[in-house]
């Protein structure tokens, strides 16, 4: 073999499918049609045994964090809304394998989702394209259950309708 072949090993992480699907559904609430395509997608970061999903419309930031195992890596989904529908069909342990597309020089790649015998591939974008989460210094901080808070907001949303 005269040419040196470079084999790229995909970075791999595993999450619970139901937790991932629920987290993706929750953060997708903030995703809207935008002139900036990256703002229509969800960012995913695996770090320190956690999977952190983020979405923004530049005024609201939604972040969901779930347990994960595997390598540390990050990417931005392409077609997040479709992926949300696909994840509802999976059950059990979900494996995400991210491979950088070496044919391109912009850091794009693809992610393969595997759950049992079902698999799917989605294009990804580099997290360099995603805006940074602004630092907020608050005098008071508190913890809240996001699901309960959203339920309360939905319960009184009728009062804001015209």
Regions found by a protein language model. Name each.
Residues 1-162:
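Structural preference for solvent-exposed beta-strand-turn elements
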């Amino acid at each position: 073999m005269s040419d040196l072949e470079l084999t790229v090993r995909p970075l791999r992480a595993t999450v619970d499918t139901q937790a991932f699907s629920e987290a993706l559904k929750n953060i997708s609430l903030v995703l809207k049609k935008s002139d900036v395509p990256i703002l229509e997608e969800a960012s995913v970061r695996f770090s320190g045994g956690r999977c952190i999903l983020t979405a923004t419309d530049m005024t609201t930031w939604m972040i969901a964090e779930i347990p994960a195992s595997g390598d540390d890596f990050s990417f931005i989904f392409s077609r997040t809304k479709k992926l949300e529908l696909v994840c509802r069909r999976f059950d059990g342990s979900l494996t995400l394998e991210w491979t950088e597309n070496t044919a391109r020089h912009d850091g794009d790649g693809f992610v393969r989702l595997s759950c049992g015998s079902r698999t799917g591939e989605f294009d990804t974008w580099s997290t360099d394209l995603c805006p940074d989460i602004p630092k907020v210094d608050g005098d008071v901080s508190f913890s809240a259950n996001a699901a309960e808070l959203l339920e309360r907001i939905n319960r009184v949303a009728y009062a804001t309708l015209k």
